[in-house]
């Protein structure tokens, strides 16, 4: 077996947006949200099922998987591979929007059902070392949890370091799958949950159609391009900041040697920036 990178947009939607295998999504939600007893999800309806892009290279129109359970509760599961500006604002905006759009004007508020956002992040976002975190609306003084309809759960893959032999809970096994499936050749022996087993089977490249593999490769290229843009933007921002430091120091008549030390640049780099500033 050769597994795909589950973090890939096409792979993610194919596995979790499969209307024929909703047990995959049910298992994932119950494990990540740690639902027990009557709270456990028994059925889900996928609102935006998996579809291939219409043309080669087209960005997938569905970047997440949305579903409802038998109680009407909404779930938004999103894979985010890069830390883009405003990510936290967007998450809150779209989750609250989905919550409010459950009813039309004039309908009663009690019809609103809880909305859960699950963000799978391939980068570190919070300062905490925890790889799984839940964010609720709590009373600041008493920590009372009365406002329960909106909840955010984040999985930060870069903070998860357990090996396959260290996996104990189904939650850990799901997160291991998300992060490491592409590096495996077989389904781990300690995987006994049927939903997760089916997820591994759907992640097997040998079971994919040619069109799906092409779309998968296109999505991988698009992802690398996007990461490259972000890195380039960060690099440009750092260079511009260095130039500002050099300019301020030069205006204060500081020696080039001191400017280089303060800006953490070489003397040659400082001189090049000064020449550039002279031409402006």
Predicted regions and their residues:
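Elongated, amphipathic alpha-helical interaction scaffolds
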Residues: 1-280
């Amino acid at each position: 077996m050769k597994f795909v990178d589950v973090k890939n947009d096409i792979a993610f939607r194919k596995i979790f947006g499969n209307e024929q295998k909703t047990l995959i999504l049910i298992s994932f939600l119950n494990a990540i949200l740690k639902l027990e007893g009557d709270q456990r999800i028994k059925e889900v309806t996928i609102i935006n099922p998996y579809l291939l892009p219409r043309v080669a290279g087209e960005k997938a129109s569905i970047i997440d998987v949305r579903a409802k359970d038998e109680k009407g509760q909404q779930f938004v599961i999103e894979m985010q591979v890069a830390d883009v500006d405003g990510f936290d604002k967007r998450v809150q905006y779209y989750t609250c929007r989905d919550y409010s759009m459950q009813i039309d004007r004039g309908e009663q508020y009690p019809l609103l059902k809880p909305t859960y956002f699950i963000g799978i992040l391939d980068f570190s976002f919070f300062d905490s070392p925890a790889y799984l975190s839940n964010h609720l609306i709590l009373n600041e003084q008493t920590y009372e949890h009365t406002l329960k309809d909106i909840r955010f759960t984040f999985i930060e893959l870069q903070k998860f370091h357990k090996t396959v032999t260290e996996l104990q809970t189904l939650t850990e096994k799901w997160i291991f799958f998300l992060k490491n499936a592409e590096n495996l050749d077989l389904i781990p022996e300690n995987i006994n949950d049927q939903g997760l087993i089916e997820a591994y089977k759907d992640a097997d490249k040998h079971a994919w159609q040619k069109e799906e593999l092409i779309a998968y490769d296109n999505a991988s290229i698009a992802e690398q391009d996007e990461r490259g843009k972000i890195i380039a933007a960060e690099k440009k921002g750092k260079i511009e900041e260095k130039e500002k430091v050099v300019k301020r120091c030069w205006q204060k008549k500081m020696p080039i040697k001191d400017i280089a030390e303060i800006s953490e640049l070489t003397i040659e780099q400082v001189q090049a920036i000064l020449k550039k500033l002279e031409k402006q």
